[in-house]
Amino acid sequence: MPIDYEHLMSLRTRGERVHYTDRDTLLYALGVGFGRNPGNPNELAYVAEHAGLKTLPSYASILASNTLLDDCGWEASRVVLRDESVVLDRPIEEAGALLVDREVATVSDQGADEGALIGVASRARREQDGQAVFTARRTWLARGDGGFGGPRGSSSSRHILPTRHPDMTHPCETRADQALLFRPVVSFTLEGADTVVTDDGESSLERHSAGGVAVRPDIAWRHRIG
């Protein structure tokens, strides 16, 4: 069935409890590549509890995951994550319980050929005192659901890559088993466990992407400072 604008805009949950342990945060860090060099204290702090375990800021994307749009009527096989962002109010603790408010924030009809854009906002606060922890936003592109008659909305500006050199470049090699390590962070699915044969005849794990992190060989992260 086609998606319904009024129904989508009414979707929200309040105070959903999300509990996580230090085992969860540690496993996430291993899954995205930390711990390749156990002698590096900067890596060890994210994968060993005796080192004063820290939580990666990007773990917020996992804590914000939910089933809010599971039955919204879109053609799920043609849905892709368009963009996401996280704003931290304070560091995420290594273990704890959060109360998360989620809602569909935006819905725009880009036309039958372009699809629909659906934005979800998740705001998390600590259960014990209500202090804000983070706000996560995701925009989904439902490629098969455009032309449903909803408002087009204002088109967001494209992200333009800077032409100058990055402030910092840190290339790192992804372990061959990293996709397998990352799977249990989200769910045990076949994705990320299938093997593919590369052009040179070598067999390797298929690239796996979830929770805002792409796991693939020879990845390089570039961060702009300031």
Region annotations inferred by a language model:
Residues 1-81, 150-153, 160-226:
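Hot-dog-fold acyl-thioester-processing enzymes
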Residues 1-14, 79-170:
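HotDog/MaoC-like acyl-thioester-processing domains
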